[in-house]
Amino acid sequence: MSLILKNVDVAAETRCQLGEGPVWDVKENRLHFVDIFGKKVYTFNPSTNSFTSFSTELSPGAVIPTNKSSLLLALNDGVYLCDEGGNNLEQLLEIEGDIQGNRMNDAKCDALGRLFGGTMGDGNSPTGSFYLIANGGAARIRENVTVSNGIAWSPDNKVIYYIDSALQSVLHSTYSLENPADIKFKTFVDFPSSFGIPDGMCSDVEGGIWVSFFGGAAVRRFSNKGILTHTIEMPVNQITSCAFKSGTSMLFITTASLNIEDKAISPLAGNLFAIDVGIEGVPVSTFDLIGFNA
């Protein structure tokens, strides 16, 4: 039996089509996230309970703060830099720009600021890949990916977790900060279809991972042994990702409102949620621009 958590609050009424990729910005003390299909990048300020947004021409799969005064955006054909208002957009590196129908999806930095992110096609065929993006270039870590999604690390940085949603599981591998490309994934935990589709995730200081389940109306925590320990019951069905406020046990959760034309059916769908889960999250790093002409 897992501990059931229900006291989830609406943090921001964003009504995203496909809210995704929440990440805490330590420098600005704010949360960034994206609406992939709505083509927007959001910034939520919990101290004022307010948010701002800017639109993008391409679909943003992820937004990552950098070690300079800029944001990194994972867009359809690669990674870009812009300022915090979405201005001065410039491509940093092309990723699969030659593969028709593919786009960047979820991305996250390791403890040394190196970016891991993946691509996907139509969500049904394994046309995507998983990449390490650092030092001015990109290295393919895994091929034949269908829907590249959640990424997380253990608190000691010795394990990397990864989700290709089509596999209905979380993969893991030993990880070395000295040799980050040396990754050999194997299955960590499989999920029944009744859980929904595994999407984004994050990790906590006790070694657990928090997995968002699209179509499952829940975020679930699994110990480092793969045992289900906590279930956050959500008031909406399409749960996409989650991220901790750095240094706290406050978990932010993004959601979607796909194919919900009547808002009365699910009035809270697509909003940003928050809940104190009682376990502190693993801090996330900004993207290190070393090696890039930026």
Label each PLM-derived region with a short phrase.
Residues 243-294:
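Blade-level signature of beta-propeller repeat domains, shared across WD40, Kelch, NHL, RCC1
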Residues 7-13, 49-55, 90-97, 137-143, ...:
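A short beta-strand motif characteristic of beta-propeller blades
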Residues 173-180, 277-282:
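Short loop/turn segments immediately following beta-strands, especially the blade-tip
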Residues 40-42, 78-80, 128-131, 169-171, ...:
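A short loop-to-beta-strand structural motif that recurs across blades of beta-propeller domains
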Residues 67-69, 84-85, 131-137, 220-230, ...:
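Flexible "stalk/tail and boundary" regions
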Residues 87-141:
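Hydrophobic alpha-helical segments and helix pairs
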Residues 13-28, 57-72, 98-114, 141-159, ...:
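Beta-rich, blade/repeat-based domains predominating
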Residues 25-26, 31-36, 72-77, 117-124, ...:
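Conserved beta-strand positions in repeat-built beta-propeller and related beta-rich domains
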